[in-house]
Regions:
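Active-site beta->alpha N-cap acidic-glycine motif
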Residues: 62-158, 162-166, 173-176, 180-182, ...
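Repetitive helical segments and hydrophobic/amphipathic motifs
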Residues: 11-12
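A broad, low-specificity signal for short, low-complexity segments enriched in glycine/proline
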Residues: 55, 79-83, 107-108, 146-147, ...
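N-terminal pre-catalytic segment of deacetylase/amide-hydrolase enzymes
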Residues: 2-8, 18-94, 101-114, 256-259, ...
Length: 294
């Protein structure tokens, strides 16, 4: 009950205004044990049992520094969620949650464009509907868009109908502005379970994307702290979590991008990173890690 009240409170903030950053503290990853989830209502879309529609691939212009990728690896069987990927090479994906923001997201897009880098944006449906032009720009400049729910609620605390609306309304808003259907989603707060991960993948056709690098930028509104934490903890195959609704996070990005690029990292979208994922035993032991900072 307490978790549900927290989720409803935070959802109200998004209802008030998408362009205003949340002030509530964002909890860490919440993983509900399978036995607890089994006591909740069955979740799934009205077309349960039918195969999900294949995501429509984005058609975008190559960025100025298009990353040359190796051939895709064979998709791991029954893998519904990812915190990071096992890759041959210094490939990483940086992700931004909770936008688009009227001011900070365009600023971030400018920073990415100047460097020819790609990112993945996990958008809140209400904000996506409010800023269709920003959504179009995200796709036009080569970035990926994922589903982050309609109103930023903890999806493991809602019933079947509410979950369906959270997912489908967000997908509809994304398609309305971009013509695309997302291939991945991120549950708000990381609130998920093995059962939900399977449902999102098999019923909605979206892999669940968590993270392996978290600068806690929602809590520590300091650009230097945010950049330092990302730089120190990034590793090949990392999925980096950040939030484009915070000015301090966006201000940290030039240092993050320039330092990690100088160390040899290659920024790709989440879907590109997933395509490179392979069993750990197949990843070459000699995969070079980027040169440590002086």
């Amino acid at each position: 009950m307490k978790r549900l009240l927290i989720g409803l409170s935070l959802a109200g903030v998004f209802l008030a205004a998408c362009h205003t950053a949340r002030t509530q503290s964002e909890p860490q990853v919440i993983v509900v044990p399978p036995d607890e989830m089994s006591r909740q209502p069955a979740l799934g879309p009205s077309t349960a049992g039918s195969p999900p529609a294949a995501p429509t691939p984005a058609t975008v212009k190559p960025s100025a520094t298009t990353v040359s990728l190796p051939p895709p690896a064979a998709a791991p069987a029954n893998k519904h969620s990812y915190n990071s990927c096992n890759v041959d090479g210094p490939y990483i994906a940086i992700t931004f949650d909770d936008g688009p923001h009227a001011v900070h997201t365009p600023t971030l897009l400018d920073i990415l464009k100047q460097r020819g880098l790609k990112a993945t944006f996990y958008v809140v449906g209400q904000c996506a509907a409010e800023y269709p032009d920003i959504m179009k720009r995200i796709v036009a400049e080569g970035h990926e868009i994922g589903n982050h729910s309609w109103s930023h609620v903890a999806l493991n605390s809602v019933g079947a109908d509410s979950l369906r609306k959270q997912m489908e309304n967000t997908n509809a808003a994304i398609k309305e502005s971009t013509g695309l259907r997302p291939a991945t989603m991120r549950p708000p707060y990381g609130a998920t379970s093995a059962r939900l991960n399977k449902l999102f993948d098999e019923e909605y056709g979206m892999k669940v994307i968590l993270w392996s690098v978290d600068p806690l930028d929602w809590k520590n509104r300091n650009a230097a702290t945010v950049s330092s934490r990302i730089i120190q903890n990034t590793h090949p195959g990392a999925i980096i979590l950040a939030h484009d609704i915070h000015a301090t996070t966006v201000a940290a990005m030039p240092e993050v991008f320039d330092t990690l690029t100088a160390r040899g990292y290659k920024f790709v979208t989440v879907s590109e990173l997933l395509a490179l994922d392979r069993p750990a035993q197949l990843v070459k032991k000699e995969t070079p890690a980027p040169t440590p900072a002086n």
